[in-house]
Amino acid sequence: MPKYFAEKVLGHWLYFTTHCILEAMHVHASRDSKLREKGAAKFFVYADGSSRMMVQGTLRDHEVPVIQAFIKQHYLEMFAKWQELSDNGFYGETASR
C-alpha cells in the first residue's frame, strides 16, 4: 500500500490502498504499520488542499486539524503520488485522464 511519505505525522502513516484508486483522491491516517483500513481515518482532498474527514477512525479530536493542516501543506506532492496509480482527481472532480 503506497505511503504518501516515509515518515509519520503525529504517529500516523498517511497512505492509500490500491483499492482506493477507484475513488477521488483521499488520505488514510493510521497508527497501524500494516496499513489496514480498520481504525484508519479517511480524508477526501479538494483541489485547493482542504479536506473533508469522512471517517475519524482512532484519531483523537485534537489530531484531526493537525493532519488536515499537513494535508493542505503537502497536497500537491501527495496528489503526484496518487496520480502514479489513479486516473481520478481531487474530491468533487471528474477523472483527470
Language model features with spans:
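A short, structured beta-strand/loop element
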Residues: T18-H62
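Short, charged/polar N-terminal "headpieces" of proteins
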Residues: M1-M25
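Well-ordered alpha/beta subsegment
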Residues: V55-R97
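Generic detection of intrinsically disordered/low-complexity segments and helix-coil linkers/edges
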Residues: V9-L10, C20, E37, V64, ...
